[in-house]
Regions:
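Transmembrane alpha-helix termini and helix-breaking/packing motifs in multi-pass membrane transporters
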Residues: 33-57, 265-296
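Juxtamembrane helix-start elements in MFS-like secondary transporters
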Residues: 60, 152-160, 208, 297
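Hydrophobic core of transmembrane alpha-helices in multi-pass small-molecule transporters
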Residues: 1-3, 209-229, 233
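Loop-to-transmembrane helix entry/capping segments in MFS-fold secondary transporters
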Residues: 15-24, 153-154, 241-260
Length: 336
């Protein structure tokens, strides 16, 4: 992913085009999520070795192997059916200008220091961690919410897909809003919409299916608005840092954001498991037909709704107060 994200920064210096490329990437990523959400539980049911539960090692292993093989095939198709096209500058002046914008190469430690001095890169990196932490919370929480709050695994498909389909749909219109209001405004609006979705589901979730779908659609729209802008904002933040320090941080900058995303996913998964264990979750109770303790239901509700809402609210305040990358980039470009 690091080379892929880096190419978005290198393909064009146009802020709108960067945002548009990031939005397209998110559209197809979301489409993949919809496919997985629609087939995951079905595949577990097909490959389970138990008549009492679908959550067996055999079922998870075979299901994940199928997804991994599909990913490898698609990756090979991408590699062998695409080509980098590099065009040199037509004039010396243009070449000098591009070199100045690209910055100079530096050692690893010097590049790291340049990144840490770039407050906008730090903010988008932290925001990426938060968003991916939240995504894994409700991605894992979908299964547990259906089983231990709704007590009906048949609800899983619409619970998961109401988020993914809304996310997928909204990203077809976000480029228009981005062109009019800018990436930062759309990203922040997405966080507000996402937060309202989590808050509404926390307060009214479980009342009726329609109400839950409405708030899940809000979550999906928020994730789509923020996610569609994220890669473009990373590219802008790296460009800002390069102009400010004169050091090329494209590779390491994108690597840092990618690492933050993976840490968010990994830590979110671990926190979810630790919290459930702390609440008294015991998987063997399901096989015996015994209900989980009430504390488990309470913890699932907190992890699925309240924790994401709290994290979004904090991140939104940070963005509003400290993130002004687009404004500062325009000032720097006007002064050149």
């Amino acid at each position: 992913l690091v080379p892929y994200y880096s190419m978005i920064s290198l393909m064009t210096a146009n802020p709108y085009e960067r945002g548009f490329l990031g939005n397209i990437q998110q559209i197809f990523q979301t489409l993949g999520n919809v496919v997985v959400n629609s087939t995951f539980v079905t595949l577990l049911g097909i490959f389970t070795s138990s008549t009492e539960t679908i959550y067996t090692q055999r079922a998870f292993t075979i299901t994940m192997l199928i997804y991994c093989i599909a990913m490898i095939l698609v990756t090979f198709f991408c590699v062998f059916s695409t080509k980098e096209r590099v065009h040199s500058a037509e004039s010396t002046d243009e070449n000098d200008k591009k070199s100045a914008n690209a910055g100079r190469e530096a050692g690893t430690w010097e590049t790291v220091k340049a990144l840490l001095k770039n407050k906008y890169w730090v903010i988008v990196t932290v925001s990426s961690f938060v968003v991916f932490f939240i995504v894994i919370m409700f991605a894992m929480g979908n299964v547990y919410y259906c089983q231990y709050v709704l007590y009906d695994m048949g609800q899983y498909s619409w619970v998961a897909n109401s988020v993914s389909i809304a996310q997928f749909a909204v990203m077809f219109v976000t480029p228009a809003f981005m062109k009019k209001f800018g990436k930062t405004a759309v990203y922040e609006a997405g966080m507000v919409v996402m937060g309202l979705g989590f808050l509404g589901f926390a307060v009214f979730g479980g009342s009726t299916r329609i109400v839950m779908i409405i708030f899940n659609v809000l979550k999906g729209c928020g994730v789509g608005m923020a996610g569609g802008m994220a890669l473009g904002m990373v590219a802008d933040a790296i460009t800002y840092g390069t102009k400010k320090t004169g050091i090329d941080t494209v590779g390491l900058g994108n690597a840092g954001v990618s690492a933050a995303q993976k840490i968010g996913l990994g830590l979110g998964t671990a926190v979810f498991g630790w919290a459930l264990n702390g609440a008294g979750y015991d998987g063997s109770l399901d096989a015996q037909g015994i209900a989980q303790p009430e504390s488990v239901t309470t913890m699932v509700k907190f992890l699925y709704n309240w924790l994401p809402f709290i994290m979004i609210a904090i991140m939104f305040v940070i963005m509003i107060m400290f993130y002004h990358c687009e404004r500062d980039l325009k000032k720097m470009e006007a002064a050149e």
